[in-house]
Amino acid sequence: MPRKRQSTKARIVKSAWNLFYKNGYEQTTVEEIIAASKTSKGTFYHYFKGKEALLNSLSYLFDEKYEELVPLIDDNMSCRDKLLYLNHELFDMIEHSIDIKLLASLYSSQLVTKDKKSLSDKKRFYFQWITEIIEAGLESGEFKNSSSAGELMNIYAMYERALLYDWALFKGKYSLTEYSDRLLPHVLDMFEKGV
């Protein structure tokens, strides 16, 4: 999958979340986000109604991380190992650079919003790339084809959302990355044996 050039919207999102982590959400101003992202006020408001709208943008930051990982994935890795690697890298980034209160806010807002639910948007890079990996696993016979790629993608995404929710619920009292490193292999065992 080719690496995409970082869009203006993605640059704003990444800058905002870096500032939220460093300074806290409440202490970060729109002006600081504009300066850090090297954009104009008009450009910022073209993409976002205000700072609050950025809470729903965390999934874009996740996609940015995945796009950074594209060139690092060895095509010779098994599909299982690709999924383990991607999950480890994403959760490590979340654990060490995302304010857990903001993650909790994102999850709660996704349950009540009437707007687009970014965490379940199938057009996201995340869903497309993980589905491609799962399809390759099904085609090669690495994953048993008793379920479709879409069904396995739903299970994988549900696993990640559940673990992130639990980690936020318990206020990060355990290592998200280490816990997932122990649990995800069991989920992928099901992919190999059949669901």
Q: Which residue stretches match the model-derived regions?
A:
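Short secondary-structure transition hinges
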Residues: 91-131, 142
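Basic, helix-initiating cap at the start of DNA-binding domains
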Residues: 1-23, 27-39, 53
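Short hydrophobic/aromatic patch on the recognition helix
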Residues: 38-48
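Hydrophobic alpha-helical connector segments
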Residues: 57, 71-97, 149-156, 177
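C-terminal peripheral helix-coil segments that are non-catalytic and often amphipathic
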Residues: 85, 89-92, 128, 132-140, ...
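Alpha-helical DNA-contacting segments of helix-turn-helix folds
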Residues: 48, 55-62
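All-alpha amphipathic helical-bundle segments outside canonical DNA-binding/catalytic cores
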Residues: 118-123, 139-155, 178
